[in-house]
């Protein structure tokens, strides 16, 4: 077993090309997994001490740490032995020749954007910083002790980029095989379709002998403000989105458009289609939703009390105008296990029993509260991607998710969609580049809105649309 403690530092050799580097003030190191790292088994290495210097050597790298002080450029270095020459990294050095990876989303993007780092670099090495990120214990988040200051993963590979991706998969976990039908043809349009219109679309595909495998129902499958009619259930609590539409989140079928959801889903299944529902969960289950009473009762039976502070400047006008109702609603709380288990039970499981095959997580609410409650530094998106993917495995099915890219380590939760990009030649060119470089961080399954999402091309967009299809 190749793990060695020197003072407050621990070095763990995970593969010939990857070493974990930790520093903890109390010498209590982290063995639980994180959203990024899942492996803790070790690879053999040659470990020696000469006076005050520790040397850890494998076929691909040699690490040297002198003294016992916190890491600095002067006391920690790694030599990379690949491609016939040594490249030296000192603590704090940045990747100067990185080949890039991919953006989390193309929301609002119109043209080229800088790409974040991937694991592949012409430098022949890369460092992933997992410092401060929450641990996973018994399937849930656990804050990392404040004394655990540094947690780095050094990848050494030279020009052998395949070995870098192989080591990434070993350390962070392999990407599971997606469901077969995911590879098929999808139909998705943000439009208030009726049941008859959904069925007509499926029939038209069949009439033209064009394959269709997945029918996506965007936000209008549930009641929401823009299509609100007198007598419809209406949200009066929440932050909302896009001009204070607080019906952006919802879990009650719009019976005007889809009077019999089970019948519609069954009909689509008989036509060979899978059914996916759009989900903006940021406002959670509220009192206008048909499962509200069960949801509240379940939460109270677990002793749950509101713990997410209200962001006053983001509260919708509708909520402010209806404070006198005194109806109990809870803010969405992805950081609380009782809340999320109750949410999945009362929203997702109930609707999945009607035949829905999986969910499209359309998270856009980082503007309100980017970080998971009680977990500083953890964005909602990677954590929700993990939760949604794991919850999609019910009934012994393969996991299936559809969301924006959550960053390093999120390759374990396929697949991804790039969001609301502008229509235009510059965006198309960048999208092609970004899709290719996504592989540099293990993001292998990208879906894009064909033709973009907003802004027409001056002079017509027919050719741009056709090129997008290509």
Segments predicted by a language model, with ranges:
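A low-complexity, Ser/Thr/Gly/Pro-enriched, surface-exposed linker/loop concept
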Residues: 14-52
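Glycine-rich, histidine-containing beta strand-loop boundary motifs that form or position
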Residues: 15, 23, 58-60, 65-67, ...
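Active-site-proximal substrate-binding groove within the catalytic cores of carbohydrate-active enzymes
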Residues: 21, 111-153, 162-165, 173, ...
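Short, solvent-exposed loop/turn and secondary-structure capping segments
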Residues: 32, 66-68, 75-77, 129-131, ...
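Catalytic and substrate-binding clefts that recognize carbohydrates or anionic sugar/phosphate headgroups
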Residues: 48-182, 188-191, 195-196, 202-207
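Aromatic-lined carbohydrate-binding/catalytic grooves of carbohydrate-active enzymes
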Residues: 176-371
